[in-house]
Amino acid sequence: MKIFFKNMMTLLACLMFLVCSGCGIKAESDKNKVAYSVTDVTGTVIEFSEKPKRIVSMGIGSDEILLELVEPERIAALTYLSDDAGISSVSIKAQVIKGRVQRNNLEAILSYAPDLVVVPDWDGIDFVGQLRSAGIKVYVHKTPNTMQ
């Protein structure tokens, strides 16, 4: 009887160990789960596990779109051109975003610790490569070139 009881306790301990370790593995895999992915104009697939929280925009067109579609708290910086009422349709809305960046200034962009940088397709591909090499997700968007 003592041997049976000892074997049952050992079996129960092994089962508890397996159950507890199985829970830990599942929780770890959920953390790295991809919620959605997007493909930019260069064909690069960008995967997101959650909505970006610190977006930097590198073009006035993307400034205008972001300010209309995204909560201001999720925008870390816009281009300095967004303040110019002569060329920006969102110069007043842009005032709530404090951060400003200029073209191809890697250090300034990195200082905002972005989780996404939105870049127009006319910007240099070398600069996009530098951003990606720094571990930043970069979405390159197509820029319209006609009114049609």
Feature roles, as predicted:
Residues 1-11:
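Bacterial N-terminal signal peptides that target proteins for export
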Residues 7, 22-63:
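Bacterial Sec-exported substrate-binding components of ABC uptake systems
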Residues 10-20:
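Bacterial N-terminal signal peptides
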Residues 25, 34-35, 45, 116, ...:
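Extracytoplasmic substrate-binding proteins
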Residues 32, 69-71, 132:
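Short, structurally constrained coil/turn elements
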Residues 57-112, 116-121, 127:
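A short, structured surface patch at a secondary-structure boundary
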